[in-house]
A protein has these predicted regions:
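Catalytic cores of the polymerase beta-like nucleotidyltransferase superfamily
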Residues: 1-380
Length: 380
C-alpha cells in the first residue's frame, strides 16, 4: 500500500494537472506521519510545491473556477471534494533574537529550497517526513532528511534542531504528541526542557493544543507537572490550574469548568474567564448546583407535606423555585447524576391547562407544573 493508492481519483486528476504546470508536489506534515503510524490518509493534506511560484498555482485555480484562500507565507488553501488542501512554498525560518512568542522568526521563501533546508523549521523529526508524489507515474518517494521514519518506529519524539527550544508552543506540542500517540520523549529533549521560556505563552495556543490532545484534563495535569518539576516561569493567568487535578473523562471546556468548580468553587470564575466563556456560564453552574444540593437534602416527608398543600395557600415558592431552576438550567444535569426523590422525569409529562393557570395566584403560576408533579408523585 502507498499513500498515492489512497488518494481518490478526482483528487489525483487535480494533482496531475498541477504537476503538468511544472510543479513538484510533496506531501508534508501530519499526513506522512499518520500514514506511517496507521496506514490512513487524512482529509487535511499539506503539500510543499517546488519549481514554480505560488502565483502560478493561484492563476490555475482561478482559471479552473476553484475557490481558494490566500494565507500568510504564500500558502494557498482549497476545499476540494471534502479534502482540505494546503499548498505552500518551501521556506526557511530565521530566529528573531529576543522574541519569545510563537512567531519568533522571519521567513525566507523559495521554490528551489532543498528538503533538508525547508524541513529544518519543523518541530519533531516525525513531522519532518515528506512523500514526493509523481502522479503521472502513480509513484512516490519518501523524503526523510532527519530520520523521522525510524523515530516513528521507535515511538520517540526527537527535536530537529536547537531552534526547538526557542518556541514556547513546542513545549505544548511536546505534551500533546507524547500523550496522543503514546510516544517517549527523547533524552536530548528531556535534558534541555528547562531551556524553554514560557513567560509569554499565550492562552490561545494553550487552549488550541489542549483541545487537539483529545484529553484536555490530562493535558493540563501534565502541563502542571512539568512546569512545577522544571520550575518554569509562566504567566499569572496559567496559575489557575495549580492544585487542580483532572481525569481522562474531562474532554470539553464545560467538563473542566465543572470539575474545577467541584474541587475549588472559587476557581470556576477564573476557569470560565480563561476560556473566554460568558460570565453567566459559571454563575449558572453555581446556581444549578445550589438548587441541586437543596433538593437533594429534602426528605420524603417534606415533599409529601408540600404536595398536600394547595398551591393557592403557599406564600413563597420555596422548594418549587429550586425545581424550576433545575429545569431552566438542565444542561448541567449530566454532571450531577445522584438520584433525587423528585427529579426531571416527574414533571416532564405534567401539563397545566389555562383554567388551572388562571385560578392560581400570579406569583405562583410559573411553579404550578412542579407542584402538580409533586402531587402526582407523592399522593397521600
Amino acid at each position: 500500500m502507498t499513500i498515492a493508492s489512497l488518494i481518490p481519483n478526482e483528487l489525483k486528476d487535480l494533482l496531475r494537472e498541477i504537476e503538468a504546470l511544472g510543479f513538484s508536489l510533496c506531501l508534508v506534515g501530519g499526513t506522512p506521519r499518520d500514514y506511517f503510524l496507521n496506514k490512513t490518509l487524512s482529509y487535511d493534506l499539506d503539500f510543499e510545491i517546488r519549481n514554480l511560484e505560488a502565483s502560478v498555482l493561484r492563476s490555475f485555480f482561478k482559471n479552473k473556477k476553484i475557490n481558494y484562500t490566500e494565507l500568510p507565507y504564500q500558502i494557498t488553501r482549497v476545499d476540494f471534494h471534502g479534502f482540505d488542501l494546503e499548498f505552500s512554498t518551501p521556506r526557511i525560518e530565521r530566529q528573531i533574537v529576543g522574541n519569545k512568542t510563537h512567531h519568533h522568526f522571519e521567513a525566507e521563501l523559495s521554490p528551489t529550497l532543498s528538503y533538508q533546508e525547508s524541513f529544518k523549521r519543523r518541530d519533531f523529526t516525525l513531522n519532518a517526513i515528506g512523500v514526493e508524489l509523481d502522479m503521472k507515474k502513480n509513484s512516490e518517494v519518501v523524503v526523510d532528511p532527519y530520520g523521522g521514519v525510524k523515530d516513528l518506529k521507535d515511538r520517540v519524539l526527537r527535536e530537529i534542531s536547537d531552534d526547538f527550544f526557542l518556541d514556547s508552543v513546542r513545549f505544548l506540542r511536546l505534551i500533546r504528541f507524547s500523550m496522543k500517540y503514546d510516544l517517549k520523549i527523547s533524552d536530548s529533549i528531556m535534558s534541555r526542557l528547562s531551556e524553554f521560556d514560557l513567560s509569554e505563552l499565550s492562552k490561545h495556543h494553550f487552549v488550541a493544543e489542549m483541545m487537539k490532545s483529545k484529553v484536555p484534563g490530562l493535558f493540563i495535569n501534565k502541563f502542571n507537572e512539568m512546569v512545577e518539576s522544571l520550575k518554569l516561569s509562566i504567566p499569572a493567568e496559567f496559575k489557575i490550574w495549580n492544585g487542580l487535578k483532572f481525569t481522562s473523562e474531562n474532554k470539553t471546556k464545560d467538563d473542566l469548568l465543572v470539575s474545577s468548580f467541584l474541587q475549588k468553587e472559587e476557581s470556576a470564575k477564573l476557569v470560565s474567564a480563561f476560556f473566554l466563556m460568558p460570565e453567566k456560564r459559571a454563575k449558572d453552574l453555581k446556581s444549578f448546583y445550589d438548587s441541586f444540593m437543596i433538593v437533594k437534602k429534602v426528605s420524603k416527608e417534606e415533599l409529601i407535606t408540600l404536595s398536600q398543600k394547595s398551591i393557592n395557600d403557599l406564600t413563597d415558592p420555596g422548594l418549587l423555585k429550586e425545581l424550576k431552576n433545575l429545569e431552566e438550567k438542565k444542561e448541567w444535569q449530566k454532571y450531577f447524576t445522584e438520584p433525587l426523590l423528585v427529579s426531571w422525569s416527574d414533571w416532564e409529562s405534567v401539563n397545566v391547562d389555562s383554567f388551572e393557570l388562571e385560578s392560581t395566584p400570579v406569583k405562583m403560576r410559573s411553579y404550578l407544573r412542579f407542584h402538580k408533579a409533586l402531587q402526582k408523585s407523592f399522593k397521600a
